[in-house]
Amino acid sequence: RERDDILLVNIDDAAIEEIGAWPWSRDVIADILIRLREAGGTHAVFDIEYLSPGQTGVNRDYVRSQFPQDYREVQEEILSYIDEFATAVHDGSIPKDYVPEISEEMISYINSRLGGLSDEITGNIFRDNDAYFADAIAFFAHTYLTINTERINENEDAVKAEQWVRDNLLFSNVVDPHRLIDAENEKTRKDSQFEKGISPAILSLIQRVAGAGFPNVYIDEDGVRRRIPLLVEHEGAYVAQLVFAPILHILDPERMVRKDYRLILENALDPADPASGVRRDLVIPLDEDGRLLINWLKKKFSVKDNPEEGSFKSISVFALYACDDIEEK
């Protein structure tokens, strides 16, 4: 059935036309995430993989607001100093013999102020966009990024991120006595060009999330995505599917038990009203390959011109991006 509390925020042609060519710098995504939180969003799931560091960017807030103010203050101060000096020389308040000495003092002072302004510009005009995005992720609170279930990265930073994820984000409350999940994972992995393993988002981002899951999708022979594996085993723990991960955090099952063609969420919160505190076992039926079969609604997934007619409510990400410009005006 349809749920009105799910919103798709689309990076669509309209947004790219207005904001600029994709990929965008991560400060843009960070600002959008902040706006989504302010608009009442409770959980944000990114299906974008951040597997490598982003580029340092220009601190637009500083350029727009603080820099003009700082520059104006220094400019007014220097011009006032020069004007006072010129007036004093003109009316004789400063004897001519002292003009060279005072001129040197003035030059030294101006150099000092310009040097300070230069240091301030250098220190503020550039921004670590990954750090800024990480702060936005933490501000939103319930943000979910990706853990690819293939070993794509093998550098030192990737190894650290993998270990952190293994210690903090994977699920250990899965009971699979017949190792069905692992066998099904192997069947899915047979055509992969990468080794078995995990590749999470970069450490500086993944450390700030509420959770993470795998975005890997599998397409049926007719080109339709209708089957989704829910769990992937990794070194005795489990990575949840990207959207399944926040669902698990909301439902908070005591255990997940895999039996034949079922995944049982034992003693989970009632999905109809998790806040009620009522708990019961939930049974998720699976197909012969251990995947969830999506029961698509008989309507288009997304309708560009009339989002209300799609399977889920959707908006262009530009609607959130434009809030900054509207607020400034």
Segment roles from a protein language model:
Residues 24-26, 307-317:
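Short intrinsically disordered coil segments
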Residues 1-302, 328-329:
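Non-transmembrane functional regions of envelope-associated proteins
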Residues 312-329:
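A Trp-anchored, charged/polar loop motif used as the substrate-binding/catalytic surface
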